[in-house]
Structure formats: structure tokens, C-alpha cells
Amino acid sequence: MSLVLCFLLMSLFFMYSFVLSRLWRKKIAIRLLLYIQDNVTLIVFLNKK
């Protein structure tokens, strides 16, 4: 169950990175990506507990 959730989050993250990398404001895109990545890491960490 958690493995499926992890895969889902990863695919979502890659989708976001693909969309954001196409934007011309790359600095904002990178900041958004880092924010999303931190949230995903937090969610995964909380689910493991």
C-alpha cells in the first residue's frame, strides 16, 4: 500500500517537474519543486511511522 502511494507521489513529482521546467521562470519553478519535494518527503516520513 505504501509502495503504491510512494510511486504515485513520485509520478506526480515528475509530472510537476516536467510542467514547471517548461515555464520560462525557472527560478520560481525550482523553488516550487523544492517545496513540493519537501512536502512529499514529509508525507512519506509520516506514513512510515
Swiss-Prot record:
Origin superkingdom = Bacteria
Q: What is this protein called?
A: Protein YlcJ
The species this protein was found in: Escherichia coli (strain K12)
The residue range of the signal peptide is 1-21
Q: Which Pfam families match?
A: YlcJ (PF23688)
Record gene name: ylcJ
UniProt induction comment: Expressed during exponential phase (at protein level).
Q: Which UniProt keywords apply?
A: Signal
